[in-house]
């Protein structure tokens, strides 16, 4: 069966399996804005499913065959396995189906400027920064982010300008379904090792993505990452680099940090200062993200002073070192980081915040990732005073039986860390409430559902304050 095209289904019922996902919920909003009729399903009720329901989309919680009855097109993500009852029923009925990344590529078609932000780390933050910068600079872009940005009111924005900006995710090589005219590469590192064989395989996927660029296009890459620069040298299109190195096109000059780790710097191109940035989000990695946004905006002839002003107002994306509340004088934060390098980076920022003791609550994500990066996990929370480790979040995988969270805890202890296995959210909350002290800071980390622990603790606190009914 030929791949269906979304444009052929305007006015027809489209069903989205996994509609509550960060990307899928945004794409649903984009389709709604363009007049498409939608239904959806997800296995969890979340703010995303509730929000879509408020917009008029019938969303069913739980997957069953009946959900696709009456649909004329079914959209799914790679996280929805072939044995999902809705996918099975769609196939039985002969319904055309479309994978999420293919849909995104189709929605980008026809945009004069199609920007894809890729990289192992920093995609969402960089895309969010660039979105805010382009809006402030007057580009009126259409935006698709794999997270939520208050500045645009969520994960998507439908604009009337020439620019379509999206995250370009390397998992399952899904970014190869896109047709970018501009690509931003934040970095290339080991991840998604359930799909890729090794780092060379990962780098080759990025190579194939960059080679989708037209000759008149632009590749904007991290000039301090040798894997990125090696790929840039292979391209026929225009290339722009950013970073700390003296050979980078865009560099931060007069770089300083405040007590919370927030950077201030002049954005300099080939030695000429074109704007000043004072970030409100902490971490050296955000200097790279901001420079990437500046360099990319420059390729579109944006007013760099306005771009820098926008970056100076950037408050961060949801689930990126996001403060979620305070209980008993304890500050609660959450971060999406799930790779050891990301956890290490965000803990370096958390350590700079005022606190008594720093708690790291880690939800390891997928058995394959834990197995391949096991040694890195054992020391990545060294900046924390205490590490709590929940059971591994399986996501799309089945338990192979040979890797458990307790093995991480034992390895951390062997490396001198104070670590405790708290298998469930209830176990974790109980341990925290028994042992935390006023002035402590708790940071939950992971890209699974660990953010729901923060919600759970806040809900329990509100119920306690309300008293018996």
PLM regions with names:
Residues 5-7, 30-33, 53, 67, ...:
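Phosphate-binding loop of NTP-binding sites
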Residues 41-42, 60-63, 98-105, 144-147, ...:
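Beta-strand->loop->alpha-helix junctions that form or flank phosphate-binding loops
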Residues 14-16, 74, 115, 141, ...:
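Conserved hydrophobic helix-helix packing surfaces used for dimerization/oligomerization
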Residues 36-43, 219-223, 359-363, 384-394:
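Short internal beta-strands
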Residues 16, 40, 143, 183, ...:
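Structural beta-sheet core signal
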Residues 378-438:
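C-terminal helical cap/extension that packs against the catalytic core
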Residues 1-103, 226, 248, 282, ...:
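N-terminal leader/targeting and accessory segments in enzymes
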Residues 3-15, 23, 27-34, 111, ...:
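Nucleotide phosphate-binding/pyrophosphate-handling subdomain across enzymes
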